């Protein structure tokens, strides 16, 4: 029965490798409890999945999309992008905020030569040795 079913499915899904992926995915769905769309006739889940594809009770495109979705680790949600005018306005506001920043907002760092750094390191006291650690 499975041989005839595979031959029937090749008309619906032309690539045999893709057919194996789709039927395997559908068989896993059936084993997880998703209702079947054809009579079981005492067949195992992979054969039922092939029969569903052959009888076109399931769309191969929908099954393929579901397979891809199940394999994705990160599903992107398409969000509407901001209009270019909104982006330009936001950039101008940020630039104005930076220009208006006062002197007290600017962070300065002390400069130190290599010799001063080495002298500072030599002046450090080693921590006491602890028996517990």
UniProtKB/Swiss-Prot annotation:
Reactions that this protein is recorded to catalyse: RNA(n) + a ribonucleoside 5'-triphosphate = RNA(n+1) + diphosphate
Coiled-coil regions listed: none
UniProt entry tagged with the keyword Nuclease: no
Keywords: DNA-directed RNA polymerase, Nucleotidyltransferase, Transcription, Transferase
Major enzyme class: transferase
Record-level GO cellular component terms: DNA-directed RNA polymerase complex
Any one GO MF annotation of this record: DNA binding
Highest taxon, organism lineage: Bacteria
Protein purpose: Promotes RNA polymerase assembly. Latches the N- and C-terminal regions of the beta' subunit thereby facilitating its interaction with the beta and alpha subunits.
Assembly: The RNAP catalytic core consists of 2 alpha, 1 beta, 1 beta' and 1 omega subunit. When a sigma factor is associated with the core the holoenzyme is formed, which can initiate transcription.
Name of the protein described by the UniProt record: DNA-directed RNA polymerase subunit omega
Record lineage: Bacteria, Pseudomonadati, Pseudomonadota, Alphaproteobacteria, Hyphomicrobiales
